[in-house]
Regions:
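Beta-strand-rich cores of mature extracytoplasmic or soluble domains
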Residues: 75-175
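Short N-terminal edge-element motif at the start of the domain
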Residues: 1-50
Length: 175
């Protein structure tokens, strides 16, 4: 029995270089021009107050063109991170991040327990917010949320490090 392909609609790179914030959806597929010769793909997993939560796929290519078959075989790499989607997809002067598709049947439930912490980094009490927007009325101690990432957008240093580590594990081979 053949595995059913996900329901993904794909468009060409630069077909629509800018995506306004209000049109970014959970399940969107994006392409990021990681270097002059390399593109990487990923997916929007959720939305939090400060941006969108994404995760990269294990697909590194010399071209921003991808097929549904390639996406159906893709695995997530690294950790889920929050990006400043307004700046990257809507207002960037250089369109190195583009929404290139959408997975209609995307199921975010495997990420329902993904949470981030918020609060004063120097403080003693913190809050917790989940990917689906749930918040906990309880205040947590530093120890209780120590293993969580901050509900804050990460910059290129963080997401490029994730990608560089993956490439290093492959012996710097993109494909």
């Amino acid at each position: 029995m053949q595995k059913k392909l996900p329901q993904i609609k794909i468009r060409e790179w630069n077909e629509k270089p800018r995506t306004k914030m209000r049109f970014i959806k959970i399940g969107d597929i994006f392409c990021y021009q990681f270097s002059e010769e390399m593109f990487v793909f990923g997916q929007i997993l959720g939305k939090v107050n400060v941006g969108h939560v994404i995760q990269f796929f294990d697909i590194f290519q010399a071209s921003p063109t991808i097929t549904v078959e390639e996406l159906s075989r893709a695995q997530f790499i690294g950790k889920s991170i929050i990006i400043d989607s307004y700046t990257l997809f809507d207002r960037s002067p250089v369109w190195s991040w583009q929404i290139i598709g959408h997975q209609v049947d995307f199921d975010p439930s495997p990420f329902k327990d993904l949470a981030f912490k918020w609060g004063d980094p120097n403080g003693l009490q913190f809050g917790k917010v989940w990917l689906d927007g749930r918040t906990e009325p309880k205040i947590f101690s530093r120890e209780e949320v120590d293993d969580l990432d901050w509900e804050a957008c990460v910059g290129s240093i963080v997401y490029n490090r994730i990608l560089e580590e993956e490439l290093a594990s492959r012996g710097n081979k993109g494909v």
